[in-house]
Amino acid sequence: MIIIEKIKRGLIVSCQALENEPLHSSFIMSKMALAAKMGGAIGIRANGVNDISQIKLEVDLPIIGIIKRNYNNCDVFITPTMKEIDELCNEGVDIIALDATFRNRPDSVSLDDFFKSIKKKYPKQCLMADISSLDEAINADKLGFDFIGTTLYGYTKSTNGLDIADNDFNFLKTLINSNLKSTLIVEGKIDTPLKAQKCFEMGVDLVVVGGAITRPVEITKKFVEKINQVKR
Protein backbone atom coordinates (compact mmCIF):
# COMPACT_ATOMS: atom_id res chain seq x y z
CA MET A 1 0.00 0.00 0.00
CA ILE A 2 1.16 3.53 -0.79
CA ILE A 3 0.65 4.77 2.76
CA ILE A 4 3.02 2.12 4.14
CA GLU A 5 5.70 3.42 1.79
CA LYS A 6 5.11 6.98 3.04
CA ILE A 7 5.41 6.12 6.71
CA LYS A 8 8.48 3.91 6.76
CA ARG A 9 10.74 5.36 9.44
CA GLY A 10 10.58 8.19 11.95
CA LEU A 11 8.62 9.88 14.70
CA ILE A 12 4.83 10.03 14.79
CA VAL A 13 3.38 12.64 17.14
CA SER A 14 0.07 11.99 18.85
CA CYS A 15 -1.85 15.27 18.92
CA GLN A 16 -4.70 14.76 21.36
CA ALA A 17 -6.21 16.75 24.22
CA LEU A 18 -8.91 15.55 26.58
CA GLU A 19 -12.08 17.58 27.13
CA ASN A 20 -10.88 18.70 30.56
CA GLU A 21 -7.52 19.94 29.27
CA PRO A 22 -6.77 23.57 28.31
CA LEU A 23 -5.67 22.66 24.77
CA HIS A 24 -8.87 20.78 23.91
CA SER A 25 -9.59 22.38 20.54
CA SER A 26 -9.48 21.14 16.95
CA PHE A 27 -7.80 24.39 15.93
CA ILE A 28 -5.12 24.01 18.59
CA MET A 29 -4.52 20.36 17.67
CA SER A 30 -4.08 21.35 14.04
CA LYS A 31 -1.41 23.84 15.05
CA MET A 32 0.16 21.22 17.30
CA ALA A 33 0.36 18.94 14.26
CA LEU A 34 1.94 21.73 12.23
CA ALA A 35 4.53 22.27 14.96
CA ALA A 36 5.22 18.53 14.99
CA LYS A 37 5.76 18.54 11.23
CA MET A 38 8.10 21.52 11.50
CA GLY A 39 10.04 19.57 14.12
CA GLY A 40 10.50 16.60 11.81
CA ALA A 41 7.55 14.30 12.54
CA ILE A 42 6.64 11.98 9.67
CA GLY A 43 3.09 11.26 10.83
CA ILE A 44 0.31 12.31 13.20
CA ARG A 45 -2.01 10.30 15.44
CA ALA A 46 -5.27 12.10 16.17
CA ASN A 47 -8.59 11.51 17.91
CA GLY A 48 -11.97 12.39 16.44
CA VAL A 49 -13.21 13.53 13.05
CA ASN A 50 -13.21 17.23 13.99
CA ASP A 51 -9.55 17.22 15.00
CA ILE A 52 -8.55 15.10 12.01
CA SER A 53 -10.31 17.34 9.48
CA GLN A 54 -8.62 20.43 10.93
CA ILE A 55 -5.22 18.74 11.03
CA LYS A 56 -5.55 17.78 7.36
CA LEU A 57 -5.91 21.47 6.52
CA GLU A 58 -2.56 22.20 8.18
CA VAL A 59 -0.33 19.26 7.28
CA ASP A 60 -0.04 16.70 4.51
CA LEU A 61 1.43 14.01 6.75
CA PRO A 62 -0.08 10.52 7.05
CA ILE A 63 -2.64 10.38 9.86
CA ILE A 64 -3.40 7.54 12.22
CA GLY A 65 -7.00 8.21 13.16
CA ILE A 66 -8.94 6.97 16.16
CA ILE A 67 -12.20 7.77 17.87
CA LYS A 68 -12.26 7.37 21.62
CA ARG A 69 -15.79 6.58 22.67
CA ASN A 70 -16.98 5.05 25.93
CA TYR A 71 -19.71 2.43 26.03
CA ASN A 72 -21.42 1.19 29.19
CA ASN A 73 -19.64 -1.58 31.09
CA CYS A 74 -16.88 -1.88 28.50
CA ASP A 75 -13.15 -1.23 28.81
CA VAL A 76 -12.64 -1.00 25.04
CA PHE A 77 -12.87 2.63 23.94
CA ILE A 78 -10.41 3.12 21.05
CA THR A 79 -12.45 2.85 17.83
CA PRO A 80 -14.63 0.18 19.45
CA THR A 81 -17.39 -0.42 16.86
CA MET A 82 -18.22 -0.14 13.18
CA LYS A 83 -19.87 3.22 13.88
CA GLU A 84 -16.45 4.75 14.61
CA ILE A 85 -14.89 2.96 11.64
CA ASP A 86 -17.54 4.44 9.34
CA GLU A 87 -16.93 7.94 10.68
CA LEU A 88 -13.18 7.69 10.16
CA CYS A 89 -13.48 6.16 6.69
CA ASN A 90 -15.94 8.85 5.64
CA GLU A 91 -13.42 11.48 6.75
CA GLY A 92 -10.65 9.74 4.86
CA VAL A 93 -7.98 8.59 7.29
CA ASP A 94 -4.76 6.97 6.11
CA ILE A 95 -4.59 4.48 8.98
CA ILE A 96 -7.29 3.57 11.47
CA ALA A 97 -6.12 2.33 14.87
CA LEU A 98 -8.38 0.23 17.06
CA ASP A 99 -8.27 -1.71 20.29
CA ALA A 100 -7.04 -5.20 19.39
CA THR A 101 -6.90 -6.61 22.90
CA PHE A 102 -8.79 -9.72 23.96
CA ARG A 103 -11.18 -7.67 26.09
CA ASN A 104 -14.92 -7.78 25.45
CA ARG A 105 -16.13 -5.28 22.87
CA PRO A 106 -19.27 -3.17 23.46
CA ASP A 107 -21.27 -4.97 20.79
CA SER A 108 -20.00 -8.43 21.86
CA VAL A 109 -18.40 -8.93 18.46
CA SER A 110 -15.07 -10.76 18.54
CA LEU A 111 -11.97 -8.98 17.24
CA ASP A 112 -11.68 -11.57 14.47
CA ASP A 113 -15.21 -10.90 13.23
CA PHE A 114 -14.78 -7.15 13.65
CA PHE A 115 -11.60 -7.17 11.56
CA LYS A 116 -13.23 -9.25 8.82
CA SER A 117 -16.25 -6.93 8.74
CA ILE A 118 -14.02 -3.88 8.35
CA LYS A 119 -12.03 -5.49 5.55
CA LYS A 120 -15.21 -6.56 3.76
CA LYS A 121 -16.64 -3.04 3.89
CA TYR A 122 -13.37 -1.13 3.42
CA PRO A 123 -10.92 -3.58 1.78
CA LYS A 124 -8.23 -0.98 1.07
CA GLN A 125 -8.23 0.67 4.51
CA CYS A 126 -4.96 0.39 6.46
CA LEU A 127 -5.49 -0.79 10.02
CA MET A 128 -3.37 -0.58 13.17
CA ALA A 129 -3.84 -2.92 16.12
CA ASP A 130 -3.42 -1.36 19.56
CA ILE A 131 -2.28 -4.28 21.73
CA SER A 132 -1.11 -4.91 25.29
CA SER A 133 0.48 -8.36 25.13
CA LEU A 134 2.49 -10.72 22.97
CA ASP A 135 -0.48 -13.03 22.39
CA GLU A 136 -2.59 -10.09 21.21
CA ALA A 137 0.20 -9.03 18.85
CA ILE A 138 0.48 -12.52 17.39
CA ASN A 139 -3.30 -12.68 16.94
CA ALA A 140 -3.39 -9.27 15.22
CA ASP A 141 -0.54 -10.34 12.96
CA LYS A 142 -2.40 -13.50 11.94
CA LEU A 143 -5.54 -11.50 11.20
CA GLY A 144 -3.60 -9.26 8.83
CA PHE A 145 -3.33 -5.86 10.50
CA ASP A 146 -0.94 -3.57 8.62
CA PHE A 147 0.54 -2.15 11.82
CA ILE A 148 0.80 -3.36 15.40
CA GLY A 149 1.29 -0.81 18.17
CA THR A 150 2.25 -1.30 21.81
CA THR A 151 -0.26 1.43 22.65
CA LEU A 152 -2.11 -0.39 25.43
CA TYR A 153 0.85 -2.04 27.17
CA GLY A 154 0.61 -0.70 30.70
CA TYR A 155 -2.99 0.44 30.30
CA THR A 156 -5.02 -2.75 30.74
CA LYS A 157 -5.90 -4.55 33.97
CA SER A 158 -3.32 -7.26 33.30
CA THR A 159 -0.53 -4.81 32.40
CA ASN A 160 -1.45 -1.86 34.62
CA GLY A 161 1.61 0.13 35.67
CA LEU A 162 4.03 -1.59 33.32
CA ASP A 163 6.38 0.51 31.20
CA ILE A 164 7.76 -0.35 27.77
CA ALA A 165 11.24 0.34 29.17
CA ASP A 166 10.90 -2.16 32.04
CA ASN A 167 13.63 -4.83 32.25
CA ASP A 168 15.66 -3.17 29.51
CA PHE A 169 12.73 -3.09 27.06
CA ASN A 170 12.11 -6.82 27.46
CA PHE A 171 8.52 -6.69 26.13
CA LEU A 172 9.69 -4.90 22.99
CA LYS A 173 12.51 -7.41 22.52
CA THR A 174 9.97 -10.22 22.71
CA LEU A 175 7.81 -8.60 20.04
CA ILE A 176 10.79 -8.00 17.76
CA ASN A 177 11.96 -11.61 18.14
CA SER A 178 8.48 -12.87 17.24
CA ASN A 179 9.08 -12.01 13.57
CA LEU A 180 5.73 -10.33 13.06
CA LYS A 181 4.78 -9.66 9.45
CA SER A 182 2.93 -6.50 10.45
CA THR A 183 4.95 -3.31 10.88
CA LEU A 184 5.68 -2.71 14.56
CA ILE A 185 5.01 0.72 16.06
CA VAL A 186 6.17 1.53 19.58
CA GLU A 187 3.68 3.71 21.43
CA GLY A 188 2.98 4.33 25.08
CA LYS A 189 5.16 5.91 27.77
CA ILE A 190 7.88 6.97 25.35
CA ASP A 191 8.44 10.09 27.41
CA THR A 192 12.10 10.91 26.71
CA PRO A 193 14.18 11.22 23.53
CA LEU A 194 16.52 8.54 24.90
CA LYS A 195 13.66 6.03 25.13
CA ALA A 196 12.74 6.75 21.51
CA GLN A 197 16.36 6.45 20.46
CA LYS A 198 16.65 3.09 22.22
CA CYS A 199 13.66 1.76 20.27
CA PHE A 200 15.30 2.66 16.98
CA GLU A 201 18.60 1.15 18.10
CA MET A 202 16.71 -2.09 18.73
CA GLY A 203 15.47 -2.09 15.14
CA VAL A 204 12.06 -0.41 15.36
CA ASP A 205 11.32 2.06 12.57
CA LEU A 206 8.26 3.89 13.93
CA VAL A 207 7.69 5.44 17.35
CA VAL A 208 4.67 7.41 18.55
CA VAL A 209 5.17 10.11 21.19
CA GLY A 210 2.23 11.96 22.67
CA GLY A 211 2.11 13.51 26.11
CA ALA A 212 5.82 14.21 26.34
CA ILE A 213 5.39 16.61 23.41
CA THR A 214 1.77 17.73 23.36
CA ARG A 215 0.48 17.86 26.96
CA PRO A 216 1.99 20.92 28.67
CA VAL A 217 0.05 20.42 31.91
CA GLU A 218 1.61 17.00 32.43
CA ILE A 219 5.04 18.20 31.32
CA THR A 220 4.88 21.10 33.77
CA LYS A 221 3.83 18.79 36.60
CA LYS A 222 6.94 16.66 36.07
CA PHE A 223 9.19 19.69 36.40
CA VAL A 224 7.33 20.94 39.48
CA GLU A 225 7.46 17.50 41.10
CA LYS A 226 11.24 17.32 40.74
CA ILE A 227 11.71 20.88 41.94
CA ASN A 228 9.56 20.23 45.01
CA GLN A 229 11.71 17.27 45.95
CA VAL A 230 14.54 19.67 46.75
CA LYS A 231 14.43 20.45 50.47
CA ARG A 232 15.98 23.60 51.89
Swiss-Prot record:
Function in brief: Converts N-acetylmannosamine-6-phosphate (ManNAc-6-P) to N-acetylglucosamine-6-phosphate (GlcNAc-6-P).
Instruction: Give yes or no: UniProt keyword Cytoplasm.
Output: no
Question: HAMAP family from the entry?
Answer: ManNAc6P_epimer
**What's this protein's name?**
Putative N-acetylmannosamine-6-phosphate 2-epimerase
Gene Ontology cellular component annotations, sorted alphabetically: cytosol
Return the EC number: 5.1.3.9
The similarity comment for this entry is: Belongs to the NanE family.
Q: Output the NCBIfam families linked to this UniProt entry.
A: PRK01130.1 (NF002231)
Reactions listed under catalytic activity:
an N-acyl-D-glucosamine 6-phosphate = an N-acyl-D-mannosamine 6-phosphate
Biological or metabolic pathway of the protein: Amino-sugar metabolism; N-acetylneuraminate degradation; D-fructose 6-phosphate from N-acetylneuraminate: step 3/5
**Biological processes, Gene Ontology terms:** carbohydrate metabolic process; N-acetylmannosamine catabolic process; N-acetylneuraminate catabolic process
SUPFAM superfamilies, sorted: Ribulose-phoshate binding barrel
Q: Name one GO molecular function term.
A: N-acylglucosamine-6-phosphate 2-epimerase activity
